[in-house]
Structure formats: structure tokens, C-alpha cells
């Protein structure tokens, strides 16, 4: 039976994906959020889903309410109204934990690589059988006859604890979200608790020291590049067209694969997907066929060309992700100068990982930095500035403003890699406008 869902904070990446999924399943869906444009809203608008400003008037007792995790009684009028009138609502992760029980569920967790791996797993599986999925780039799909459900499993504030998937991949464990986690041990404990809830099989990166300590009642399969792993990627060839490799399990090759993606991390992501689908009983020839057609996910190594200038947009906001993104850029463009334009995201993360950020950015040929993008959850106490990061980077590093990105023009034969989880796309847009204006003036 069709229901009406109202999403409080519908532009969030998980919330927008879930809204799209429920809409495609035939339910009536609407939501509210701030006016500021966010990249997820285009999909909502194309689907005809109404996006309203926050207001008590949006809510009626016959609706099922789903509230974004950031919204509370003290900062959101709709949550306050629901609590005042004793109208029940669920948080995104609470709803998802219940929703997935009707499917064979496949989760993807990890500090880095969740979205790309979820996207890859969803892409391959949906071409073999009816599959619903939620991807952290705001993409959601609800297949009416789906038996399988692929979803991204987020560790922040332990939001993945309501989830009990049949299968799960964990890509890695790393210290992040220092506003919540106290250290690496705390992060490990969260993932270990999640692992204990996986029912049929767990797939983890074998060269991650923390993941080697994970325990679960489900069988654990390690994937990676080492012969000690259960699923081993070998005979690897990385070219400007992507990556080719074979995978073996228990000493026997199970297939030869190509992914049109770049960087060592994407070979690992693909190997995790292959391992999961092999254990779940899918045909490896079909898996190989559908891996070839994967076109990526939003804001993960998204490329465009403006007047012969190559621009890459990526969500990378942690040192490990920066290294992976720059490695991918070098693979695809080995003869070009790699220019990193990075905006640190949150003061707490910048303070905690300042030296690691500097080390990661040294993988570029030149570095430009945007002022730190603070989270709504924190206050700038003046403890760190982007200039502190610039001083630690060994490569040439400059701080730029969104109003003046002209220093980026000082490079020939370059690839520009914009990275960040804040509003780095504003800087990207300024650069694109600058390039367009230069072309007009030269005509």
C-alpha cells in the first residue's frame, strides 16, 4: 500500500537517495530543507519530488516522518513540532535498518571508498537481477520486484548499528570524524561492533592492520594484492583507459576483469565487489561484463573539459582519499602537471590531521588551498587556519579566494583536481567562468 513520506532535511546525500528509492517504489514523497543549492537536489527535482522550506505546515499526522540526523528539537521547527504533538519520526539510519529486512542486503562500510564501491556493486548487481540501492552520492533506485538491496553503511556517530546485512564489505579503517571518534581504537570498536551484525559473509581489505583484528560470527574473507588474502588481484595492468587484472580464490583464477577507473584503490574496490558476488553465487563472466560499463558516481573523480582544460571534481576530504585521487589522476594523465586545489573540511579534522594533509598534498605538482570549510556542528576558535597547512606543504602552495582564482592560470599542460567536502565547487565554477571569459576575449 502506498504511503506518504516527508523527509526533514531531504537534500542530505543519504536522505535524497532514500527519497528517490521510495518514490520509484510508488510512494508519495516530499521533503524540506534549506534554500542553498546542493548537488543532490537535481535528482529530486527531475523526479518531481517537492522540496519545501522548513515549516510546521509541511507536516500532517498521516505522514511517515524521516528526519536527518543533524536536525533536533532545538534547531529545526519541524522536529520541534513533531515532538510537541507526539508525532513519531525515525532517523534515516533507524528507518533504513527496518527497511532492509525485506531484502537480501549487501552493505558497504569503511572510512574511505564507500560510495565508489557501493556504486560499483549496485551497477553490476542491477544488471544481473532486480536490485534496489542507496548510494552516498545522492543516487537511489527502487525496483518494484527487487530481492537484493545494496546500501552504503556510514560509521559516523555509529549510524550503521541498526543494520544487520546478509553481506558486507569493509574497505578500510582509518581515523576520521575527530568531532565524534576519540581515536583509532574508538573507530575500530565501532566497525567491530558492526561486523558482528553481518549474517552471511564479511569481505575486508587484507592489508589493513585494523581489519585483520575484526571478528564476526559470519565467515570473513580478506581481499587484496597479497597471496595471504582469500581473494587476490594479480597480473595488474594500469593504463590511461583503466585497470586490467585477474582475481584468484584458493589458488584458482576466477576471472579476468577490466574496470574503466583509475588508481590502486579502484582495483581494490572492484576486487571486493567480485569477492562478494562470487560468494553470493553469481556468474563471474557476467560480473566481468558489467564491470566494464561502470561510469562512476557523482563527485568521485568526475571529469569535464572546459576549453581544452581538464578539470576533475572529487569529494576527497581526508589525506588517504587525497592520495588515492592524485594517484588516479597520474594514472590517467601521466604526462600532465597535476594541480591540486583543496579545501579542508572542518576545523577539528584539519587540526587532527594537519601533517597528514600536507604529506598527501605533496603528491601533486602544485597546490592551491581554499579557506577551511567549517561544519555546522563546530565553532571556529581560531586554532587553525589554512595558511598553517600551506606552510607545511613541501610543494609550491598558495591560498586562493573564490573571487580570484587567476593564479590557477599559471600552468600549461595541466590537470586541475578540485577536492573537498565543503563548497569547493564554487571555486571550480569560478575557474570555469574564468576560462570561458578568456576564450571570449581571445576570439
From Swiss-Prot:
It is an enzyme of class 6 (ligase). Keywords: ATP-binding, Cell cycle, Cell division, Cell shape, Cell wall biogenesis/degradation, Cytoplasm, Ligase, Nucleotide-binding, Peptidoglycan synthesis. One of its GO terms (molecular function) is UDP-N-acetylmuramate-L-alanine ligase activity. This is UDP-N-acetylmuramate--L-alanine ligase. It catalyses: UDP-N-acetyl-alpha-D-muramate + L-alanine + ATP = UDP-N-acetyl-alpha-D-muramoyl-L-alanine + ADP + phosphate + H(+). Disulfide bonds: none annotated. It comes from the Bacteria. One of its GO terms (cellular component) is cytoplasm. It holds the Pfam family Mur_ligase_C. SUPFAM superfamilies: MurCD N-terminal domain, MurD-like peptide ligases, catalytic domain, MurD-like peptide ligases, peptide-binding domain. Its EC number is 6.3.2.8. GO terms for biological process: cell division; cell wall organization; peptidoglycan biosynthetic process; regulation of cell shape.
Amino acid at each position: 500500500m502506498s504511503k506518504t513520506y516527508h523527509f526533514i532535511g531531504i537534500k542530505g546525500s543519504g536522505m535524497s537517495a532514500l527519497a528517490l528509492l521510495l518514490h520509484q517504489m510508488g510512494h508519495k514523497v516530499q521533503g524540506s530543507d534549506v534554500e542553498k543549492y546542493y548537488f543532490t537536489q537535481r535528482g529530486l527535482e527531475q523526479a518531481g519530488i517537492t522540496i519545501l522550506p522548513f515549516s510546521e505546515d509541511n507536516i500532517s499526522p498521516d505522514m511517515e516522518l524521516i528526519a536527518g540526523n543533524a536536525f533536533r528539537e532545538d534547531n529545526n521547527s519541524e522536529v520541534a513540532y513533531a515532538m510537541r504533538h507526539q508525532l513519531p519520526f525515525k532517523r534515516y539510519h533507524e528507518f533504513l535498518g527496518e527497511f532492509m529486512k525485506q531484502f537480501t542486503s549487501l552493505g558497504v562500510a569503511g572510512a574511505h571508498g564507500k560510495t565508489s564501491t557501493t556504486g560499483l556493486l549496485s551497477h553490476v548487481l542491477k544488471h544481473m537481477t532486480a536490485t534496489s540501492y542507496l548510494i552516498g552520492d545522492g543516487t537511489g533506485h527502487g525496483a518494484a520486484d527487487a530481492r537484493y538491496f545494496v546500501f552504503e553503511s556510514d560509521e559516523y556517530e555509529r549510524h550503521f548499528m541498526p543494520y544487520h546485512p546478509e553481506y558486507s564489505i569493509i574497505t578500510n579503517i582509518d581515523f576520521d570524524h575527530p568531532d565524534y571518534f576519540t581515536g583509532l581504537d574508538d573507530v575500530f570498536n565501532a566497525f567491530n561492533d558492526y561486523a558482528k551484525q553481518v549474517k552471511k559473509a564479511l569481505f575486508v581489505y587484507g592489508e589493513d592492520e585494523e581489519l585483520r583484528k575484526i571478528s564476526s560470527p559470519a565467515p570473513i574473507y580478506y581481499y587484496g594484492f597479497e597471496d595471504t588474502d582469500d581473494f587476490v588481484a594479480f597480473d595488474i595492468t594500469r593504463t590511461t583507459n583503466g585497470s586490467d587484472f585477474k582475481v584468484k580464490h584458493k589458488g584458482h583464477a576466477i576471472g579476468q576483469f577490466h574496470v574503466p577507473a583509475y588508481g590502486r584503490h579502484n582495483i581494490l574496490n572492484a576486487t571486493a565487489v567480485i569477492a562478494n558476488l562470487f560468494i553470493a553465487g553469481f556468474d563471474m563472466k557476467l560480473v566481468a561484463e558489467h564491470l566494464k560499463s561502470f561510469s562512476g558516481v557523482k563527485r568521485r573523480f568526475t571529469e569535464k573539459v572546459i576549453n581544452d582544460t581538464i578539470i576533475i571534481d572529487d569529494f576527497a576530504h581526508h589525506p588517504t582519499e587525497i592520495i588515492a585521487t592524485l594517484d588516479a589522476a597520474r594514472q590517467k594523465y601521466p604526462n600532465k602537471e597535476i594541480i591540486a586545489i583543496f579545501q579542508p573540511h572542518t576545523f577539528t579534522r584539519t587540526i587532527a590531521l594537519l601533517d597528514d594533509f600536507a604529506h598527501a598534498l605533496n603528491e601533486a605538482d602544485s597546490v592551491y588551498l581554499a579557506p577551511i570549510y567549517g561544519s555546522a556542528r563546530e565553532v571556529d576558535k581560531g586554532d587553525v587556519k589554512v595558511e598553517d597547512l600551506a606552510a607545511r606543504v613541501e610543494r609550491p602552495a598558495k591560498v586562493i579566494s573564490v573571487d580570484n582564482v587567476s593564479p590557477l592560470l599559471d600552468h600549461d599542460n595541466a590537470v586541475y583536481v578540485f577536492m573537498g567536502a565543503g563548497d569547493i565547487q564554487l571555486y571550480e565554477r569560478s575557474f570555469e567562468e574564468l576560462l570561458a571569459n578568456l576564450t571570449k576575449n581571445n576570439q
